[in-house]
Amino acid sequence: MTRTEKAPTRGGGAQKNRTGQVWAAPLPLVGAALSAGLIAVAVAGWLTGVGEVGEIADPGAVTRWGLPMSRYIHHIAMATAVGAVILAAVAIPARVGPRSRQRRRDQKAVREHGTTGDEHPLFARVMQIAAVAAVVWTIAAIAVLVLSYSSLAGQPLSTSEGFSTGFLGYVQSIATGQAWMTIVVMAGLFATLVSAVRNQAGLFFTAVLGLTAIVPMALVGHSASGDDHMAAVNSLGLHLLGVVIWVGGLTALILLAPEIRRQASALTAKDQGGPELVGTLLRRYSVLAMLALITVALSGIINADLRIESLRQLLASPYGVMLTLKAAATLGLAAIGWMHRSWIIPRLAGAHAGPGASARGLEKPALSADPWRTTRMLWQLILVEVALMAAVIGVSAVLGRTSPPVSEELPPDATPARTLTGYDLPPAPELANYFTLWRPDWLWVGLIVFLSAWYITAMISLRRRGTRWPIARTLSFLFGLAILFWVTSGGPAIYGMVLFSGHMIQHMTLTMVAPIFMVLGSPVTLAMKSLPTRSDGTRGAREWILWLVHSRFSRLVTNPLVAAANFAGSILLFY
């Protein structure tokens, strides 16, 4: 949506009219930014040769070029759909007016925006964005499923009986076909749920369903073959998780920009902090974006290390060149994110500090007197960010069809153990080997690092506020995480793949030792004391933890009788 304010003049009259207003990115520019990904697909396809005619069996130009473009649309649509639901769950109030009187006053404004009941206009719009993106995601997943079979079989698209029979076998018997069929079903179910649910539990399970679709995506492609299968799959899963939260949230945010502008302008007219609304949304998203950026960068390095063995392969091979371009773009995105956190957000936060800010000790940033200019810089930066993200995802769609320099085939002299598990047999299971052999499981490593960093940060935050936190609880929680790291990345994990005794050590330690020390650390109590409480109707980490702790499911599974039956029954069922 284009701005309606007049351009500034030297006389300053127009400047006065626009003061306190906010600027929103026009939707055509958003479309242009997203189309950068299609351009990246075309350029990367030409550089890597994935669009060239096959030497043995050619599926046709429609499949050669349609498959990477469908994958790009799939990735963008999936990220936008899931990111929009996450944004609705953590950053946007579901209802207008905390009190019935305020709610009645806002009913008229809500109806003017096409919503029903007392649903907040921003919430209604972001869920509409999620619904449309989910439909596109489902259609794109179907396209990828059909085109991937056409590419694998080397047959052009057709309605012949032979193509249909082969496609049915592909979906039923081939891992890639099964994975993409699963994604199609999950995307369709997600699209149905996102159009129907509006309560807290519905948002939670819809978001979980969308994020679960990452699993089949991580299990196919380059990660499904080659060396160190577990590291490749887990690092790719973490990479996709970060991309969905980061790219999806930002794309949903910029598609929401016109509605944000309307709401912010209405608040500004009432002198209730319109620019501050923009700053609040951006600040909440930026926390998720920062965590996602770290996850994407580190998991990308791990995954690249499995595909590239030398600097020559990185700089000379088509696969390596594309990885280098992705890394450079990611650094650029990190720089833009730093500008948001250190420059834009503080100015928007101070935009509604008011004339008495100095007396209250609130120094207003230099540009906060002109929120129009600040919000324009904000959305222009986000447009550049979305274009870079789209280009990176476009390159990734082509990389999925490009052979890496490192061979993905097992060597001819591979041992039976390596053929079955992907790893050679470890040394004899001596006691020392259980503590000296290591094979990092990056999924667990990422979770452990996050929990450790959060716990220490929360404890320091409490101490700065003058609240003491027992050091014994901290040591207990960190010791439990250390045990968790050992059992998932140390000797028990290595021997657990080939020996039943190693597997039982891993199982029992996971269920009976590590949880005890972690529970003694009282992480939920620490979260309740350290996390801020929100009063604007949105649900932050504290509100979601409270909801989970007091949910019926939580009360059921924590009942001593149910917990005992679950523990004993799982052992009987599996062994």
Features from the language model and the residues they span:
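Early transmembrane hairpin module of multi-pass membrane proteins
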Residues: W65, R71-Y72, A79, A143-V144, ...
